[in-house]
UniProtKB/Swiss-Prot annotation:
Pfam name, any one: Ribosomal_L29
Name of this chain's protein: Large ribosomal subunit protein uL29
Species: Edwardsiella ictaluri (strain 93-146)
Entry-linked Gene3D superfamilies: 1.10.287.310
Signal peptide: none
HAMAP family: Ribosomal_uL29
GO BP: translation
One GO cellular component term noted in the UniProt record for this chain: cytosolic large ribosomal subunit
NCBIfam families tied to this protein: L29
TM regions (residue ranges): none
Length: 63
């Protein structure tokens, strides 16, 4: 997910995206805790995507 793609989205769409990413992160953490996670790099990607979305939400709130 690129920051440019996210910048084009509205605040509502970003909030929806954030909820989806948080759910995905939760599922990945549960898989990791259970020893079933094969692709551990996905956790890092999702965490960074969450940070991107939160950063853009803060930027839009301040503007």
């Amino acid at each position: 997910m690129k920051a440019n793609e996210l910048r084009e989205k509205s605040v509502e769409e970003l909030n929806t995206e954030l909820l989806n990413l948080l759910r995905e992160e939760f599922n990945l953490r549960m898989q990791a805790a259970g020893g079933q996670l094969q692709q551990s790099h996905l956790l890092k990607q999702v965490r960074r995507n969450i940070a991107r979305v939160k950063t853009l939400l803060n930027e839009k709130a301040g503007a």
